[in-house]
């Protein structure tokens, strides 16, 4: 954990035990200014003080440093993203020159954890996935660790790390070429459920992991067993579903949704599951989408279903039957940057809202606010923004709900 996360844990435990900073300082024989510095992330307590500090709160040192059922685990794909700018639009037997090339740590795990670490650096974050024993794998691990994201859940294998090649052309937009690489080697057995102390575990890009769908005699598939075990460990489970050629089949989803607390999906994915044209044509009213969301809930989802159309409309239906919607101001075409990773951006915002127990409508607003930051040129010049700035951006782009 970084100093901000440790400080937040100390402050939370101190308040839970009805101690002032001065009272805690007296117990530890330090100044109250020292306690204040810890809680504001300006430094760590000395190692020799940790047992005494944990005893004062009635917790273990591990709970103090890792948080007691705190944080978010993100399980999904890991890719090394190469963005190549070229000087001509590709065409058969044509040639284009690469004018610049940049590498990033990509995939749903990197995208979501990086976003959350910038939105709220006090949240402990855990990454789970699979990379190769190669330069790309080492690069991804180092980038995650630089953001104080725990990487002990990432498995390294003797297979190339997954790679995304994004070719940015002068006028034809961006082309994505993907190699799944080591992601296909990721096995549910790599997830040590019973050592996790997070509050929420989120799964994304499930179709990239064929081993997750291997048969399990008791639960139908291995993924269902993992989700069940997480819920048994008092950890909320969340699932992202996208619509593409490799989207999970309805019979596969039926095996796992009964062990999901929350499901986030695109309108296209919802339409695919329910065999309708939702997401493929303009939406005239919300009755049809609410009816389809109810069908997903009826498959066993235990708390909430979220559905999003692009970066500006969101819906939520919870198990109690409460339905709400939110529409953000659409981003002007001249300000629109890109849409790659948009689902991960929305998931980041929703996970933040779920983690902090926001009302459903506020979760939708925050998810769309994070998306607005991501796709708008005037906001994303420095990457994701902290919570206070996202709230300000939401206020600058009024919602219609």
Write out the residue ranges for each language-model feature.
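Alpha-helical residues within the helix-turn-helix
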Residues: 15, 26, 55
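Residues within the helices of the helix-turn-helix
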Residues: 11, 22, 51
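Glycine-rich phosphate/adenosyl-contacting loop at the front of the ribokinase-like
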Residues: 63-128, 135-142, 331-340, 401
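Ribokinase/PfkB-type carbohydrate-kinase core domain
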Residues: 70-78, 141-156, 168-329, 381-401
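A short, Lys/Arg-rich alpha-helix, primarily the initiator
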Residues: 1-16
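Conserved post-catalytic alpha-helical subdomain immediately downstream of the catalytic base
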Residues: 299-304, 330-398
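DNA major-groove recognition helix of helix-turn-helix/homeodomain DNA-binding modules
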Residues: 48-63
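Short alpha-helical DNA-recognition segment
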Residues: 18-37
